């Protein structure tokens, strides 16, 4: 089969080489690569007195956070926890969902919802900070309108795809990181003692003695917020490319942070009033640096928007999120565009910009959500290591170490809750509620689907086919079978064929869709249940693949016809004479929930919220990629309360 968009698969740049490394730098490190724009500024705004011990301690915290959190946890450990080459919290969950722990999905949806919330906040703070650099040239420049204009353009171009400009991201980000490193080295030469920050002693002393340690750590954490995105992009670039390019990126980042620290210690009196990132830039290249910063912010925003589309596409196949219309603006595999989500993200980013106005206030909203994502990833990695037979001691040490580190960062970021962290938690909470309700409601719907053994109905289906007194409904009649167990069939499907309106056809097709734990699987198996009459097709679809049943069934039928396992030529003499194939018609059984069908108030509330959430999605025929002109939807009630009272006779009719 071809990919989900119907196009041939386009290979990703997973091979190690200059091109692969260049593409990796452009795709993976946009978020973490723009952190120098605001991290040092956020540290200075904690209120801690500026002196050598404070700056050395803060820089030491940055260096060792990048080392422990990004390098060891994500590059060395998490990148090895891949799902057939794919990474990210949902890909990791897909590896683990067969485990006996029924609540493990809670960790996944908490992590996914907080990661999505971060994807709304990051473009706002990154672009705003870059544009604020213009204030050093023209203090009265309207930052907010310019930021909103850039954000509008970024979201508007999503519908056209970014294939053409995306190829230049790698070159641009390479120049960006070189700029960070070179300017950092120049600034370091003015205060070489800043290199003492590599000693973790200064970090320990600062955190032990400073009364503002939690505020400082909250600011320091911003340097590693892009680490989760690094893991999510594993499938695009490959582990080796990410690991090798990270060595270069980390070096450039640390050099720039050290350069900013050197400038602060040389300008203690004025450090509070300016952004050290722009302050270390020579005046003759300041405009160029601002342009580069804006471009890097756009690249970072683009990566997060694309990442959001990918996460929600995975969530749909994992039954965490309602099916939505997905477009493929280019022929590049994996490049998606979800119009509803693009609009929702745009509105969210605009509201955050208008609510907080400047990047200093946005810093309070930033970091809290992604800390929770990282904590959930740590717990899932612990399950993964245990499932792979890793030494128990190592697994316990890993979970204990990183739960402690991230727990401390979480505590530090919670101190910013009232100042803006509530915004991230509000967005995360709404997304979590939607995912949780969707998962629970889908389980309820599956729980109350009644099934019957399919082989009990072979004869009657054959009899209906042969009964010419029944008008022919279609040459080929296709049903999507929602029964979980092999060899069983949804009883409402049988009711549709036999009872509701007997449907005579030449061939009956039952489509079983199995969403598998691997990302890009697209396979099928076909079983002939009744020769020349009844067929069962099972489609195995990876969690990154968009289901398009019409397209896939056409390929299945072509395979069967070519191998002479089925003859689909129309049975009408005039059409058969000319070799015209018979028509296809799809029947979708749609269960409608009625609140009065359950006496459980909690269940009623959950299903009512589910009904509201489902309105943002698309109906089942579109969700399955069916040609709606060939589809008939039959609505049946979803009966949850089977204990229906009997009617009591109150009078007898006497016949005279």
Regions found by a protein language model. Give the residues of each.
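The structured alpha-helical core of multi-pass membrane proteins
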Residues: 2-656
């Amino acid at each position: 089969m071809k990919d989900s968009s119907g196009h041939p698969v386009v290979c990703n740049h997973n091979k190690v080489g200059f091109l692969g490394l260049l593409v990796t730098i452009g795709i993976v490190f946009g978020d973490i690569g723009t952190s120098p724009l605001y991290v040092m500024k956020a540290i200075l705004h904690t209120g801690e007195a500026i002196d050598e011990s404070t700056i050395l301690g803060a820089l030491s915290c940055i260096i060792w956070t990048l080392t422990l959190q990004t390098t060891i946890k994500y590059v060395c450990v998490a990148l090895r926890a891949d799902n057939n080459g794919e990474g990210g919290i949902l890909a990791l969950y897909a590896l683990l969902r067969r485990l006996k722990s029924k609540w493990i999905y809670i960790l996944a949806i908490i992590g996914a919802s907080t990661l999505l919330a971060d994807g709304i906040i990051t473009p706002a703070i990154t672009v705003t900070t870059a544009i604020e650099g213009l204030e050093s040239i023209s203090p009265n420049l309207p930052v907010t309108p310019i930021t909103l204009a850039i954000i509008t353009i970024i979201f508007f171009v999503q519908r056209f795809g970014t294939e053409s400009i995306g190829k230049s991201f790698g070159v641009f980000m390479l120049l960006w990181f070189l700029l960070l490193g070179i300017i950092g080295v120049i600034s370091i030469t003015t205060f070489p003692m800043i290199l003492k920050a590599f000693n973790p002693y200064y970090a320990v002393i600062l955190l032990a003695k400073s009364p503002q340690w939690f505020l400082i750590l909250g600011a320091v954490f911003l340097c590693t917020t892009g680490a989760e995105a690094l893991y999510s992009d594993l499938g695009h670039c490959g582990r080796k490319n990410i690991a090798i390019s990270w060595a270069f990126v980390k070096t450039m980042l640390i050099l720039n942070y050290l350069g900013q620290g050197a400038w602060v210690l040389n300008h203690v009196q004025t450090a509070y009033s300016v952004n050290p990132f722009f302050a270390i830039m020579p005046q003759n290249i300041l405009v160029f640096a601002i342009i580069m910063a804006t471009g890097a912010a756009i690249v970072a925003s683009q990566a997060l928007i694309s990442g959001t589309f990918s996460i929600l596409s995975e969530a749909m196949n994992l039954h965490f999120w309602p099916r939505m219309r997905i477009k493929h603006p280019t022929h590049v595999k994996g490049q998606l565009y979800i119009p509803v989500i693009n609009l929702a993200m745009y509105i969210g980013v605009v509201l955050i910009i208008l609510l907080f106005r400047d990047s200093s206030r946005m810093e309070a909203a930033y970091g809290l959500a992604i800390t929770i994502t990282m904590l959930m990833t740590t717990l899932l990695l612990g399950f993964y290591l245990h499932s792979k037979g890793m030494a128990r001691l190592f697994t316990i040490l890993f979970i204990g170490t990183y739960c402690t580190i991230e727990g401390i960062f979480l505590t530090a970021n919670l101190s910013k809750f009232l100042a803006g962290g509530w915004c991230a938690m509000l967005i995360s909470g709404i997304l979590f509620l939607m995912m949780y309700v969707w998962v629970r409601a889908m389980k309820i719907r599956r729980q109350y689907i009644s099934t019957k053994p399919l082989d009990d109905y072979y004869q009657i289906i054959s009899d209906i086919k042969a009964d010419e007194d029944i008008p022919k409904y279609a040459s080929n009649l296709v049903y999507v079978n929602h029964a979980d167990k092999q060899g069983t069939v949804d009883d409402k499907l049988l009711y549709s064929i036999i009872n509701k309106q007997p449907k005579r056809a030449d061939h009956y097709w039952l489509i079983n869709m199995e969403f598998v734990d691997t990302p890009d699987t697209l396979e099928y198996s076909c079983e002939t249940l009744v020769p020349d009459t009844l067929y069962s097709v099972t489609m195995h679809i990876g969690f990154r693949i968009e289901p398009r049943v019409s397209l896939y069934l056409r390929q299945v039928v072509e395979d069967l016809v070519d191998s002479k396992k089925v003859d689909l030529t129309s049975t009408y003499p005039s059409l058969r004479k000319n070799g015209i194939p018979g028509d296809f018609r799809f029947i979708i059984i749609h269960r409608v929930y009625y609140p009065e069908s359950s006496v459980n108030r909690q269940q009623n509330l959950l299903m009512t919220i589910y009904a509201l959430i489902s309105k943002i999605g698309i109906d089942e025929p579109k969700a399955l990629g069916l040609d709606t002109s060939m589809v008939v939807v039959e609505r049946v009630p979803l009966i949850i309360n089977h204990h229906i009272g009997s009617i009591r006779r109150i009078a007898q009719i006497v016949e005279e």
